[in-house]
Amino acid sequence: MSIWFWYALMAVGLGGMVWCAKNQRRVANAQLYSVICLVVVAISAVMALTSFFGDGELEQSIENAKQFELAKVDQIADFVNKNHAGQKVVVLIKSDMLNPSEHQIDTLKEFSSRVQGQVTLLEPVVLQITDPSTLQPEDPESGEMPYIPSPEEELNAKKFNDKFKECKAAGADVVVNFAGMPAMPEDTQKLIIWRWGTKDPKVVLAEIMEMNFDPKSLLGPVSAFVASKPDAQFDYLKDTAPENFKEAFDLRYVIVTKENAPNVLDENGMIKSGLK
């Protein structure tokens, strides 16, 4: 079918989700319809990608994405081994990352295997998020589904702060955060880790997508954070990511630390262009 058909079907699905969200308290089974619309959107997105790129290009894009993610995990593990050897490390990870699909890497497994023997790895702390595919109707007869929280509701400052406190209570010297950041930028500024002192764990952030604060001010409680290079040139559909993890990482990312911050951050606290 034409790619425009899948775009149209995706638009219908999105429109249905919006309608269900606005009418979930007035319309019976609105949440069930919302889940159905979500499935329609997901299927349409996959079919649109397949129609647009073709099987070969889509597969190439997926493999490149996996290689860059592996490279990121590899270099974070290398940083932890060199800078926090012998310390107690806990990984903060989202629940949906514990059972990765064939198109995703097993972040926890890959990181753990790379730091084994270099640090004391504590039990991971899991940030639970809702998986719509596991939900069952609250009322089997009507088929009414339970309320599905939005990303803003699930990935908020309170939920992250509770998990950071859990990491600290576990006795960790270092928290490696692969769970990302709150969905809302203003929530990111409310995280307790920015106020942690010398007696609190150090934090390694796997990636900061949008920095609505001065990164230089973070490099007290934060041992390091990974950021994308603003001028990285790479065509996911046509290029092939380097097999060497460091080369792949350096192509797209930079690890920012207190030591290299003056060289990689500009006067506004943003990542400089032209980094090698």
What annotation goes with each model-predicted range?
Residues M1-Q31, V39, I43-K276:
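A residue-level marker of the well-folded mature domains of exported/periplasmic proteins
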